[in-house]
């Protein structure tokens, strides 16, 4: 029977923990434990994707003759609307990066408030994007779903 003595050496770099295990007889055993992405990074990525989906469905809907309810958005051309979406995502990302590093309690409160606001905004914008997508595909029960979603949002 061969006995092995092992040593773990943790190496950490930006959100990833890698543990390399060395054993006797020049054998190398690697156990890579990749820590999952931080929840706020996942939220920011989701926020950016939902904003892109909202942009594409809104522009396509206007091209197909649908009426945009937001008067400000309907006054923009597609290029300026895209710049607005990019500015919104970049500003939210910069604020999250800045407030993430704050250590005092007010800074942490601002950070938590930003995360909560982005989560709510992502959920509502996601619902709007799905609604636009259903309208674009000609889904006949969209108006019923709009009434259901409006009722659910009114309860929240």
UniProtKB/Swiss-Prot annotation:
Keywords for this protein: Cell membrane, Membrane, Transmembrane, Transmembrane helix
Record membrane topology: Multi-pass membrane protein
Cellular location(s): Cell membrane
Superkingdom assignment: Archaea
Membrane-traversing stretches: 42-59, 79-98, 105-127
Key word Cell inner membrane present: no
Protein name, entry field: Uncharacterized protein AF_1335
InterPro entries listed in its UniProt record: DUF5658
Pfam families in the cross-refs: DUF5658
Presence of the UniProt keyword Transmembrane in the record: yes
GO cellular component, one term: plasma membrane
Predominant cellular place of this UniProt entry's protein: membrane
Coiled-coil segments: none
